[in-house]
Amino acid sequence: DSKKVILFSHLHHDHIQGLGFNNDIFNPGCNIELSSALHESNELRSKIQTFFSGSYFPLNLTDKLKNLKFQNFFELVQNNKDDILIESLEMNHPGRSFGYSITHENKKFVYLSDNEFEHWQLTKLCDFCENSDIILWDGMFRDEDLIDKKGWGHSSIEQGAEFFKKVNCKKMLITHHAPARTDSELDKINSELPDGIELAFDGMTIEIN
């Protein structure tokens, strides 16, 4: 049997809606642990059950699917037997959210989505991302959008590019694109990004060598 882990940064709708349409959860031979640095396992289970049962979803996923297990984040980190180091850092986002760093065999991936970048975060973020292979950065906005979107909990593409200059990282992927941005607009943005930075897209896979 295989085991997979799903780490939730937070439970805003755009981060949980895909769970009920993930084919792996309906495979009884695939054991899946769900965890979050934001919620204890019982609270996480209760919230997921609310979203995926009753009026919101035809199946009660937490009761129906026996291959889904909820694990306290710090127990997941401590009990990990696969030589994988998982760390968390709180982001600047309404309702709270967490970023994650995952290191295995000296390869490091950092997830920093849903964060409204502020200068006071710089030192902690640099330390968190030091010697990383890939940073996944929240680039929902352009710099000119930031004034009107203060408090929305997201960063800009340009802020990501500036941060990339300050941290020891091989590659940055920009995610959480603004919903109104068209594919052609994203293609144009992608063509203008500095070396080492590109836009992430659905279905993208990256092999860290």
For each predicted feature, which ranges?
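Structural motif
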Residues: 37, 112-114, 179
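Acidic active-site catalytic centers that drive phospho-/nucleotidyl reactions
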Residues: 14, 114, 138
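Active-site glycine-centered loops adjacent to acidic/histidine catalytic or metal-binding residues
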Residues: 10, 114, 176
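Binuclear metal-dependent hydrolase catalytic cores
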Residues: 1-110, 120, 125-126, 186-209
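Cap/insert and terminal regions of metallo-dependent hydrolase folds
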Residues: 117-204
